[in-house]
């Protein structure tokens, strides 16, 4: 269970470097994330590479305090499922649900808060890349740079040259963020090296099924 929680934490912490930013682009991404938080429920499905090999994770959110996550690791095909409802958490052992320790529930609450919290102070800078066709769907694409990861502002004489060199680094990590222009909702997020966008380290897709329900196990 803790391994699954660690993987979820890694997803929440995934950040990237980006192209020069635009205030308007940042507002578009922030508006999309705010709209997602206000949705009745949404589902995130991810594929990523971990030390244990390929990982598939499905996480469902029902703001303000409900979450379900199902994690499958390649070396152990039996999925690990857990539920959080109003600060209490349960894990599924075979066909039986068991209440999890308060400290594990607390970790899940923290993860939920990270996803549903305000991103305005942490998202960093954003660059618009325009309309992009993704698997047959036209989406608005963005690259995001997390200022907290970059560190304090570089005021050295060669700061501009350092910035140009960083953007020229084809192995630098990038986060690509995609928004549906019709609904204004986030649709996917990709974390990859700049020269390997077709082989992402982490990829998440977002859907908004109206039938998501998360209840405490009986």
Which residues does each PLM region occupy?
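Bacterial N-terminal signal peptides that target proteins for export
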Residues: 1-9
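N-terminal leader/targeting segments and the immediate start of mature chains
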Residues: 2, 13-66, 213-218
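Flexible, processing/modification-adjacent segments and terminal tails
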Residues: 24-29, 37, 91-155
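Short, solvent-exposed coil/turn segments at beta-strand boundaries
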Residues: 36-42, 59-69, 83-89, 137, ...
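Beta-turn initiation residues at beta-strand->coil junctions
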Residues: 46-50, 71-75, 92-95, 146, ...
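An acidic-aromatic
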Residues: 56-116
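Short loop/turn microsegments at loop-to-beta-strand junctions
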Residues: 79-80, 127-128, 174-175
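Gly/Pro-enriched, hydrophobic low-complexity segments
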Residues: 138-218
